[in-house]
Amino acid sequence: MGTLTVNQNKLQKRLRRQAGEAVADFNMIEEGDKVMVCLSGGKDSYTMLDVLLHLQKVAPIKFEIVAVNMDQKQPGFPEHVLPAYLKELGIEYHIVEKDTYSVVKELIPEGKTTCSLCSRLRRGTLYTFADEIGATKMALGHHRDDIVETFFLNMFYNGSLKAMPPKLLADDGRNVVIRPLAYCSEKDIQAYSDLKQFPIIPCNLCGSQENLQRQVVKEMLQEWERKTPGRTESIFRGLQNVIPSQLADRNLFDFTSLRIDDSATPRFVNVVNL
C-alpha cells in the first residue's frame, strides 16, 4: 500500500485510537500477555490483527501475538491464503484443523441456520487450543455494530438485556476473551479492509443465509442509521451508561425497600402561598 490520502490516514488513526482506548478502558492486554488473535479470514479479524500489531509496537508494555485460524474443513476452503499472508507478516501462527463442517451439516437440517452451532463448536475448539499454547487472552474481531446487534437480538428473541462484553471470562474460568474493536464501527472496518486489500475468505457454510435473525436486526439498525446518523453509536453509549433504578430487574436494584424519606427537603414550590 502506497502513501495514504488525508482521509485514509484519518481512518487508520481513528481505528488505532479507538482500539487503543478500548484496550485501555477494559484493561484487555497486560504486561507479558500472550494474545491469541483468532483469524477467520474476514475483514474484522484482519483489521484486528493489523491494529494489534501496531499497538504492540507503540504500547508501553510488552506482549506476544499469536495468530490462529481454524480450518473447519468446509468445501473449497482456500488453505493457502492465511498461511501465505501470515508468513509475509512474519508472525507466529497456527492453523487448527477440526472438521466441524461435517458435524454441523449432520445435525442441522438443510435450510436452517447453522451459525449458532458452528460458533459454539469453533469457540470450544479455540478455547482448548488457547489453553494448550498458554495464551492468556483470546482476541475476537467483534466490533461496535456486532455488540449493538447482539443487544437487540437478545432483547427481541430472548427477553434479556445482554450484549457482547468487550472483555469476558469464559465459563471454564481458563480463558479471557477480549474484543479490541469494541469501539470501532463496521463501516470504518470495511473501508479499512478495502484500503488494505486483505485476502478475504468467504464463509461457504453460512455466508449465504440471508434469513438469519441477525441480518434482520442489522438491516433495522442500518435503516435507523440512514434516517438518524449516529444512532448506533448512541445506543452503544447507552450500554455503557446503565441505570438499574430506571429498569425493572429486581436483582439489580432493591425496589422493595423504597420508602418516602420524611426528612427530605421538598422539591416543589408551594404556588398557593406565592
From Swiss-Prot:
EC numbers for this chain: 2.8.1.-
Motif position, PP-loop motif: 40-45
Protein known as: tRNA-cytidine(32) 2-sulfurtransferase
Reaction equation(s) it catalyzes: cytidine(32) in tRNA + S-sulfanyl-L-cysteinyl-[cysteine desulfurase] + AH2 + ATP = 2-thiocytidine(32) in tRNA + L-cysteinyl-[cysteine desulfurase] + A + AMP + diphosphate + H(+)
Pathway note: tRNA modification
Keyword RNA-binding attributed: yes
Cofactor binding, note field: Binds 1 [4Fe-4S] cluster per subunit. The cluster is chelated by three Cys residues, the fourth Fe has a free coordination site that may bind a sulfur atom transferred from the persulfide of IscS.
Main location, first listed in the record: cytoplasm
CC annotations in GO: cytoplasm
HAMAP family: TtcA (MF_01850)
Keywords on record: 4Fe-4S, ATP-binding, Cytoplasm, Iron, Iron-sulfur, Magnesium, Metal-binding, Nucleotide-binding, RNA-binding, Transferase, tRNA processing, tRNA-binding
Name of the gene: ttcA
PANTHER family (alphabetical): AMINOTRAN_5 DOMAIN-CONTAINING PROTEIN, SULFURTRANSFERASE-RELATED
Record lineage: Bacteria, Pseudomonadati, Pseudomonadota, Gammaproteobacteria, Pseudomonadales
